[in-house]
Amino acid sequence: GGERRLGELDPLSAAEREELIHTRNATDQAFPEQATLPTLFAEQVARTPQRTALLEADGGTLSYAELDAKVQAVADALRAAGVRTDERVALLVARGPHLLPAILGVQRAGGAYVPINPDHPLERVRLLLEDCGARVVLVDERAATLGESLGETRVLHLERLPQSTGDLPAANVAPGDLAYVIYTSGSTGMPKG
């Protein structure tokens, strides 16, 4: 044959191209349409209760069963505080071992979590709380003093929650329920959620 430019040569056969582009990239999985995060998490706990679920920065670990106990304690405290489906619950929690139990606990209780940076000034925190309508705020020890300055808002300290007794009925969480509200800085400088 005649001369061809290097860019015109195909280094792969049709079968190799099919294998690399289509077969190896066929990673999609059917997702159960009626699944919720609390349901999927509970299924994982049931399958692998002793497996490591959370690695902490200090080297500590939590198994799925241990994480589930913390999640249930958060959910029970929120249900006892009157949190219902789609109700917003603010999280004044730093990134770390308390954040995941807080998120999953809010969702298990049927609420929607609203993460708020605990490093924000008090007035900004108050503005976000007012805007999102959260009646309940979860705080970690780092944000405990900030939580004391929130007036009428019910503040629950994650490190002080009692263990779950299992007395409260589970929330009926549905796929269409609100899961979270995220605030952005907004183009005007006012947060938008």
Features from the language model and the residues they span:
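Carrier-protein-dependent adenylate-forming modules in NRPS/ANL systems
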Residues: 1-17, 24-193
